[in-house]
C-alpha cells in the first residue's frame, strides 16, 4: 500500500502518523508516506512535530476523539483548552 501511495500523483491524508514516520522520535524509514495533511488523533505525537518528519507530515491537525479528560489526568498529561475552538484544531500549515 505504501508503494502504491508513493507512486500515485494524488494528495495523501495521514491518519495519526504518516506510515514510515516514528511517532516518538520522528525518525523516517524507507519507504515513507509524504502526506499533504496529517490528522493526529487525541494528542500530538512528539515525532510528528520533529524537524526531520516535516517533509512527510504536511499540514498538521489534531482531532478530539472523545477520550475523557480524566484519562489524560491519570496519565499525567495536560492539554488545557486545546479543543476549545472545536473538535479539529490546526497545528501547522
Predicted segments — roles?
Residues 1-93:
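YjeF_N-associated NAD(P)HX repair module
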Amino acid at each position: 500500500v505504501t508503494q502504491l501511495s508513493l507512486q500515485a500523483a494524488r494528495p495523501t491524508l495521514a491518519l495519526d502518523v504518516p506510515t514510515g514516520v516514528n511517532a516518538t522520535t520522528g525518525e523516517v524509514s524507507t519507504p515513507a508516506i509524504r502526506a499533504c495533511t496529517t490528522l493526529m488523533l487525541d494528542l500530538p505525537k512528539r515525532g510528528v512535530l520533529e524537524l526531520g518528519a516535516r517533509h512527510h507530515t504536511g499540514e498538521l491537525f489534531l482531532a478530539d476523539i472523545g477520550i475523557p479528560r480524566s484519562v489524560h489526568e491519570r496519565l499525567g498529561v495536560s492539554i488545557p483548552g486545546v479543543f476549545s475552538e472545536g473538535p479539529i484544531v490546526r497545528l501547522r500549515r
